From Swiss-Prot:
GO terms for cellular component: cytoplasm. Zn(2+) binds at residues 186, 249, 267. InterPro entries: Dehydroquinate_synthase, DHQ_synth_AroB, DHQ_synth_fam, DHQS/DOIS_N, DHQS_C. It comes from the Bacteria. Pathway: Metabolic intermediate biosynthesis; chorismate biosynthesis; chorismate from D-erythrose 4-phosphate and phosphoenolpyruvate: step 2/7. Keywords: Amino-acid biosynthesis, Aromatic amino acid biosynthesis, Cobalt, Cytoplasm, Lyase, Metal-binding, NAD, Nucleotide-binding, Zinc. GO terms for molecular function: 3-dehydroquinate synthase activity; metal ion binding; nucleotide binding. Its EC number is 4.2.3.4. This is 3-dehydroquinate synthase.
Length: 370
Protein backbone atom coordinates (compact mmCIF):
# COMPACT_ATOMS: atom_id res chain seq x y z
CA UNK A 1 0.00 0.00 0.00
CA UNK A 2 1.29 3.45 -0.94
CA UNK A 3 1.18 6.13 1.75
CA UNK A 4 0.85 9.72 0.52
CA UNK A 5 2.00 12.56 2.77
CA UNK A 6 1.30 16.18 1.83
CA UNK A 7 3.87 18.92 2.34
CA UNK A 8 1.57 21.92 2.73
CA UNK A 9 3.30 24.91 1.15
CA UNK A 10 0.45 26.63 -0.67
CA UNK A 11 1.08 26.85 -4.41
CA UNK A 12 4.37 24.96 -3.92
CA UNK A 13 2.76 22.07 -2.04
CA UNK A 14 3.69 18.54 -3.09
CA UNK A 15 3.29 14.92 -2.11
CA UNK A 16 5.72 12.40 -0.73
CA UNK A 17 4.62 8.93 -1.82
CA UNK A 18 5.97 6.04 0.25
CA UNK A 19 5.56 2.44 -0.86
CA UNK A 20 6.95 -0.65 -2.57
CA UNK A 21 7.87 -0.82 -6.29
CA UNK A 22 7.00 2.81 -7.07
CA UNK A 23 9.92 2.82 -9.50
CA UNK A 24 7.99 0.55 -11.85
CA UNK A 25 5.22 3.17 -12.04
CA UNK A 26 7.54 6.17 -12.24
CA UNK A 27 6.24 7.24 -15.65
CA UNK A 28 2.68 7.52 -14.36
CA UNK A 29 3.87 9.50 -11.34
CA UNK A 30 6.11 11.90 -13.31
CA UNK A 31 3.98 12.44 -16.43
CA UNK A 32 1.72 15.15 -14.91
CA UNK A 33 4.78 17.33 -14.24
CA UNK A 34 6.23 17.08 -17.76
CA UNK A 35 5.23 19.62 -20.39
CA UNK A 36 7.51 18.28 -23.14
CA UNK A 37 8.06 14.71 -22.01
CA UNK A 38 11.80 15.09 -21.31
CA UNK A 39 13.75 14.60 -18.10
CA UNK A 40 17.42 14.69 -17.19
CA UNK A 41 18.00 12.02 -14.55
CA UNK A 42 20.89 12.99 -12.30
CA UNK A 43 22.19 9.87 -10.59
CA UNK A 44 25.41 8.37 -9.35
CA UNK A 45 27.12 5.56 -11.21
CA UNK A 46 26.38 2.96 -8.52
CA UNK A 47 22.65 3.71 -8.25
CA UNK A 48 22.30 3.80 -12.03
CA UNK A 49 24.03 0.43 -12.39
CA UNK A 50 21.69 -1.10 -9.79
CA UNK A 51 18.38 0.56 -10.64
CA UNK A 52 18.80 2.73 -13.75
CA UNK A 53 17.44 0.23 -16.27
CA UNK A 54 14.31 -0.23 -14.17
CA UNK A 55 13.62 3.52 -13.94
CA UNK A 56 14.47 4.14 -17.59
CA UNK A 57 12.14 1.36 -18.76
CA UNK A 58 9.27 2.68 -16.63
CA UNK A 59 9.72 6.22 -17.95
CA UNK A 60 10.08 5.19 -21.59
CA UNK A 61 6.95 3.04 -21.34
CA UNK A 62 5.12 6.24 -20.40
CA UNK A 63 6.61 8.06 -23.40
CA UNK A 64 9.20 10.02 -21.42
CA UNK A 65 12.52 10.89 -23.07
CA UNK A 66 15.29 10.04 -20.57
CA UNK A 67 18.73 11.67 -20.45
CA UNK A 68 21.00 10.18 -17.73
CA UNK A 69 23.50 12.58 -16.13
CA UNK A 70 25.80 10.40 -14.05
CA UNK A 71 28.24 11.54 -11.35
CA UNK A 72 30.76 9.60 -9.25
CA UNK A 73 29.30 8.23 -5.99
CA UNK A 74 30.29 9.92 -2.75
CA UNK A 75 30.31 13.29 -1.02
CA UNK A 76 33.09 14.60 -3.27
CA UNK A 77 30.53 15.08 -6.06
CA UNK A 78 28.71 17.64 -3.89
CA UNK A 79 31.22 20.37 -4.71
CA UNK A 80 31.64 23.43 -6.93
CA UNK A 81 33.31 21.21 -9.52
CA UNK A 82 30.48 18.68 -9.35
CA UNK A 83 27.87 21.43 -9.65
CA UNK A 84 29.65 22.98 -12.64
CA UNK A 85 29.80 19.59 -14.36
CA UNK A 86 26.10 18.84 -13.86
CA UNK A 87 24.88 22.29 -14.90
CA UNK A 88 27.10 22.21 -17.99
CA UNK A 89 25.61 18.89 -19.02
CA UNK A 90 22.08 20.18 -18.43
CA UNK A 91 22.90 23.12 -20.71
CA UNK A 92 24.27 20.69 -23.28
CA UNK A 93 20.93 18.87 -23.27
CA UNK A 94 19.22 22.21 -23.94
CA UNK A 95 16.65 21.63 -21.23
CA UNK A 96 14.06 24.35 -20.88
CA UNK A 97 11.55 25.18 -18.17
CA UNK A 98 9.05 22.75 -19.61
CA UNK A 99 11.43 19.91 -18.85
CA UNK A 100 12.26 18.27 -15.56
CA UNK A 101 15.33 17.32 -13.55
CA UNK A 102 14.95 14.02 -11.70
CA UNK A 103 17.25 13.42 -8.71
CA UNK A 104 17.71 9.65 -8.51
CA UNK A 105 20.02 8.67 -5.68
CA UNK A 106 20.94 9.36 -2.09
CA UNK A 107 21.37 12.63 -0.26
CA UNK A 108 24.41 13.73 -2.26
CA UNK A 109 22.59 13.37 -5.58
CA UNK A 110 19.45 15.02 -4.22
CA UNK A 111 21.35 18.02 -2.87
CA UNK A 112 23.46 18.39 -6.03
CA UNK A 113 20.66 17.88 -8.55
CA UNK A 114 18.28 20.07 -6.56
CA UNK A 115 20.78 22.93 -6.39
CA UNK A 116 21.54 22.57 -10.10
CA UNK A 117 17.78 22.73 -10.80
CA UNK A 118 17.45 25.80 -8.56
CA UNK A 119 20.05 27.79 -10.50
CA UNK A 120 19.60 26.38 -14.02
CA UNK A 121 18.00 29.18 -16.06
CA UNK A 122 16.97 30.71 -12.72
CA UNK A 123 15.02 27.62 -11.73
CA UNK A 124 13.63 24.46 -13.30
CA UNK A 125 11.25 21.94 -11.75
CA UNK A 126 12.69 18.80 -10.23
CA UNK A 127 11.51 15.56 -8.67
CA UNK A 128 13.19 13.49 -5.99
CA UNK A 129 13.45 9.70 -6.20
CA UNK A 130 15.60 8.98 -3.12
CA UNK A 131 17.35 5.60 -3.00
CA UNK A 132 18.76 5.58 0.55
CA UNK A 133 16.92 5.48 3.85
CA UNK A 134 18.54 8.75 4.89
CA UNK A 135 17.38 10.53 1.76
CA UNK A 136 13.87 9.09 1.97
CA UNK A 137 13.25 10.27 5.53
CA UNK A 138 15.20 13.51 5.50
CA UNK A 139 17.11 15.17 2.69
CA UNK A 140 14.60 14.61 -0.14
CA UNK A 141 11.83 16.41 1.77
CA UNK A 142 11.84 20.13 2.48
CA UNK A 143 13.64 21.81 -0.41
CA UNK A 144 17.10 22.26 1.07
CA UNK A 145 19.73 21.92 -1.65
CA UNK A 146 23.44 22.64 -1.29
CA UNK A 147 27.05 21.79 -1.96
CA UNK A 148 30.00 21.58 0.41
CA UNK A 149 33.06 23.84 0.45
CA UNK A 150 36.46 23.39 2.11
CA UNK A 151 35.14 25.67 4.87
CA UNK A 152 32.18 23.48 5.75
CA UNK A 153 29.22 21.38 4.76
CA UNK A 154 26.17 22.73 2.91
CA UNK A 155 27.39 26.32 3.08
CA UNK A 156 26.39 27.20 -0.51
CA UNK A 157 22.87 26.32 -1.57
CA UNK A 158 19.26 27.32 -2.06
CA UNK A 159 15.74 26.44 -0.97
CA UNK A 160 14.10 24.76 -3.98
CA UNK A 161 11.12 22.52 -3.33
CA UNK A 162 10.61 19.41 -5.47
CA UNK A 163 7.33 18.87 -7.31
CA UNK A 164 7.08 15.29 -6.03
CA UNK A 165 9.02 12.79 -3.92
CA UNK A 166 8.81 9.06 -4.68
CA UNK A 167 10.18 6.97 -1.81
CA UNK A 168 10.32 3.42 -3.17
CA UNK A 169 11.14 1.09 -0.28
CA UNK A 170 12.07 -1.75 -2.64
CA UNK A 171 15.28 0.00 -3.72
CA UNK A 172 16.52 -0.22 -0.13
CA UNK A 173 17.00 -3.97 -0.69
CA UNK A 174 20.36 -3.20 -2.34
CA UNK A 175 21.45 -0.67 0.30
CA UNK A 176 24.54 -1.78 2.26
CA UNK A 177 23.99 -2.40 5.97
CA UNK A 178 26.26 0.51 6.86
CA UNK A 179 24.14 2.91 4.77
CA UNK A 180 20.96 1.51 6.30
CA UNK A 181 22.30 2.22 9.78
CA UNK A 182 23.35 5.72 8.72
CA UNK A 183 19.81 6.43 7.53
CA UNK A 184 18.37 5.08 10.76
CA UNK A 185 20.17 7.90 12.61
CA UNK A 186 17.81 10.34 10.89
CA UNK A 187 14.78 8.15 11.67
CA UNK A 188 15.50 8.05 15.40
CA UNK A 189 16.11 11.81 15.28
CA UNK A 190 12.38 12.43 14.80
CA UNK A 191 11.55 10.53 17.96
CA UNK A 192 14.29 12.25 19.93
CA UNK A 193 13.35 15.77 18.84
CA UNK A 194 9.57 15.69 19.06
CA UNK A 195 7.77 12.35 19.41
CA UNK A 196 8.62 10.31 22.48
CA UNK A 197 6.06 7.67 21.47
CA UNK A 198 7.82 7.15 18.13
CA UNK A 199 11.17 6.94 19.96
CA UNK A 200 9.76 4.22 22.23
CA UNK A 201 8.34 2.40 19.19
CA UNK A 202 11.82 2.48 17.64
CA UNK A 203 13.36 1.14 20.85
CA UNK A 204 11.08 -1.89 20.44
CA UNK A 205 11.09 -2.16 16.64
CA UNK A 206 14.36 -0.64 15.45
CA UNK A 207 15.86 -4.05 14.66
CA UNK A 208 12.89 -4.80 12.39
CA UNK A 209 13.38 -1.49 10.56
CA UNK A 210 17.07 -2.24 10.04
CA UNK A 211 16.17 -5.75 8.85
CA UNK A 212 13.87 -4.10 6.27
CA UNK A 213 10.74 -5.86 7.46
CA UNK A 214 8.09 -4.22 5.22
CA UNK A 215 5.52 -3.23 7.84
CA UNK A 216 8.06 -1.76 10.27
CA UNK A 217 10.03 -0.05 7.50
CA UNK A 218 6.91 1.52 5.99
CA UNK A 219 5.81 2.88 9.36
CA UNK A 220 9.28 4.24 10.17
CA UNK A 221 9.65 6.04 6.83
CA UNK A 222 6.08 7.34 6.73
CA UNK A 223 6.14 8.64 10.32
CA UNK A 224 9.51 10.32 9.74
CA UNK A 225 8.22 12.00 6.57
CA UNK A 226 5.01 13.08 8.35
CA UNK A 227 7.04 14.85 11.03
CA UNK A 228 9.37 16.45 8.50
CA UNK A 229 6.43 17.59 6.35
CA UNK A 230 4.61 19.10 9.31
CA UNK A 231 7.69 21.04 10.41
CA UNK A 232 8.57 22.24 6.89
CA UNK A 233 4.99 23.41 6.26
CA UNK A 234 5.17 25.47 9.45
CA UNK A 235 8.68 26.85 8.96
CA UNK A 236 10.00 26.41 5.42
CA UNK A 237 12.96 28.79 5.72
CA UNK A 238 14.21 27.59 9.11
CA UNK A 239 13.34 30.72 11.05
CA UNK A 240 12.02 28.74 14.00
CA UNK A 241 10.89 25.16 14.55
CA UNK A 242 12.62 23.70 11.48
CA UNK A 243 15.95 24.26 13.22
CA UNK A 244 15.02 21.35 15.51
CA UNK A 245 15.70 19.04 12.56
CA UNK A 246 19.36 19.89 13.09
CA UNK A 247 19.49 17.89 16.33
CA UNK A 248 23.00 16.46 16.51
CA UNK A 249 24.11 18.23 13.35
CA UNK A 250 26.34 20.90 14.91
CA UNK A 251 28.55 18.21 16.38
CA UNK A 252 28.12 16.06 13.26
CA UNK A 253 29.20 18.70 10.76
CA UNK A 254 32.32 19.49 12.81
CA UNK A 255 33.26 15.81 12.87
CA UNK A 256 32.62 15.50 9.14
CA UNK A 257 34.78 18.54 8.43
CA UNK A 258 37.62 16.98 10.41
CA UNK A 259 37.34 13.70 8.52
CA UNK A 260 37.12 15.36 5.10
CA UNK A 261 33.48 14.54 4.22
CA UNK A 262 34.57 11.16 2.89
CA UNK A 263 33.73 7.50 3.26
CA UNK A 264 35.57 7.28 6.59
CA UNK A 265 32.58 8.86 8.35
CA UNK A 266 29.17 8.84 6.67
CA UNK A 267 26.79 11.73 7.33
CA UNK A 268 24.32 9.49 9.15
CA UNK A 269 27.08 8.05 11.33
CA UNK A 270 28.14 11.59 12.24
CA UNK A 271 24.51 12.46 13.03
CA UNK A 272 24.26 9.37 15.23
CA UNK A 273 27.22 10.30 17.41
CA UNK A 274 26.18 13.97 17.17
CA UNK A 275 22.77 13.23 18.68
CA UNK A 276 24.29 11.18 21.48
CA UNK A 277 26.69 14.07 22.19
CA UNK A 278 23.82 16.59 22.09
CA UNK A 279 21.86 14.63 24.69
CA UNK A 280 24.89 14.15 26.94
CA UNK A 281 25.79 17.84 26.56
CA UNK A 282 22.21 18.69 27.57
CA UNK A 283 22.61 16.48 30.64
CA UNK A 284 25.97 18.09 31.45
CA UNK A 285 24.25 21.49 31.38
CA UNK A 286 21.47 20.12 33.66
CA UNK A 287 18.90 20.63 30.93
CA UNK A 288 17.76 17.02 30.80
CA UNK A 289 18.00 13.97 33.03
CA UNK A 290 21.12 11.87 32.74
CA UNK A 291 18.98 8.76 32.36
CA UNK A 292 17.33 10.26 29.26
CA UNK A 293 20.75 10.99 27.77
CA UNK A 294 21.88 7.43 28.45
CA UNK A 295 18.66 6.00 27.04
CA UNK A 296 19.12 8.02 23.84
CA UNK A 297 22.74 6.88 23.66
CA UNK A 298 21.76 3.22 24.09
CA UNK A 299 19.07 3.41 21.39
CA UNK A 300 21.51 4.91 18.89
CA UNK A 301 24.22 2.40 19.79
CA UNK A 302 21.74 -0.47 19.38
CA UNK A 303 21.58 0.39 15.67
CA UNK A 304 25.33 -0.15 15.35
CA UNK A 305 26.10 3.58 15.18
CA UNK A 306 28.99 5.33 16.95
CA UNK A 307 27.93 7.20 20.09
CA UNK A 308 31.29 8.36 21.50
CA UNK A 309 34.24 10.24 20.05
CA UNK A 310 36.48 7.26 20.76
CA UNK A 311 34.29 5.12 18.46
CA UNK A 312 34.23 7.68 15.66
CA UNK A 313 36.58 7.44 12.65
CA UNK A 314 39.14 10.26 12.88
CA UNK A 315 39.62 9.91 16.64
CA UNK A 316 41.41 11.47 18.48
CA UNK A 317 39.82 14.81 17.68
CA UNK A 318 41.14 18.22 18.72
CA UNK A 319 38.59 20.15 20.82
CA UNK A 320 39.68 23.57 19.54
CA UNK A 321 39.44 22.49 15.91
CA UNK A 322 35.95 21.08 16.44
CA UNK A 323 34.78 24.31 18.11
CA UNK A 324 36.29 26.32 15.24
CA UNK A 325 34.25 24.30 12.75
CA UNK A 326 31.12 24.93 14.82
CA UNK A 327 31.73 28.67 14.58
CA UNK A 328 31.45 28.30 10.78
CA UNK A 329 28.12 26.48 11.07
CA UNK A 330 25.09 28.10 9.40
CA UNK A 331 23.31 28.06 12.77
CA UNK A 332 26.04 30.21 14.36
CA UNK A 333 25.18 33.91 14.58
CA UNK A 334 27.56 36.76 15.34
CA UNK A 335 30.14 34.38 16.76
CA UNK A 336 27.69 32.75 19.17
CA UNK A 337 27.23 29.00 19.00
CA UNK A 338 23.74 27.66 18.48
CA UNK A 339 22.85 24.08 19.38
CA UNK A 340 19.73 21.98 19.30
CA UNK A 341 19.60 20.57 22.81
CA UNK A 342 17.03 18.53 24.73
CA UNK A 343 14.94 18.80 27.88
CA UNK A 344 14.13 15.12 27.57
CA UNK A 345 13.25 12.39 25.10
CA UNK A 346 11.01 13.90 22.43
CA UNK A 347 11.62 17.45 23.66
CA UNK A 348 14.32 19.31 21.72
CA UNK A 349 14.77 23.08 21.65
CA UNK A 350 17.08 25.69 20.14
CA UNK A 351 19.75 27.00 22.51
CA UNK A 352 21.46 30.20 21.39
CA UNK A 353 24.42 31.95 23.02
CA UNK A 354 26.05 28.67 24.02
CA UNK A 355 29.51 29.47 25.35
CA UNK A 356 32.29 28.08 23.20
CA UNK A 357 34.30 27.28 26.33
CA UNK A 358 31.46 25.17 27.72
CA UNK A 359 31.43 23.20 24.47
CA UNK A 360 35.20 22.84 24.59
CA UNK A 361 35.16 21.57 28.19
CA UNK A 362 32.46 19.05 27.30
CA UNK A 363 34.40 17.79 24.28
CA UNK A 364 37.54 17.33 26.38
CA UNK A 365 35.50 15.41 28.96
CA UNK A 366 34.23 13.25 26.07
CA UNK A 367 37.77 12.40 25.01
CA UNK A 368 38.85 15.17 22.62
CA UNK A 369 42.39 16.52 22.89
CA UNK A 370 42.52 19.74 24.95
Amino acid sequence: MTRSIAVGLGERAYEVRVGENLLDEAGRHLRPFLKRGRTAVVSDETVWRLHGARLEAALKTAGVEVHPVLVPPGEQSKSFAGLADVTDRLLGLELDRGDLVTAFGGGVVGDLAGFAAAIYKRGIDFIQIPTTLLAQVDSSVGGKTAIDTPRGKNLVGAFHQPRLVLADLSVLDTLPVREMRAGYAEVIKYGLLGDRGFFEWLEANGAKVLAREPEALTHAVARSVEMKAEIVAEDEREQGRRALLNLGHTFAHALEAETGYGEALLHGEAVGVGQALAFRFSAALDLCAGQDAERATRAIAAAGLPVRLSETPGHPFDADRLVAHMAQDKKAEAGRLTFILARGLGSAFTAKDVEAQAVRRFLVAEGARP
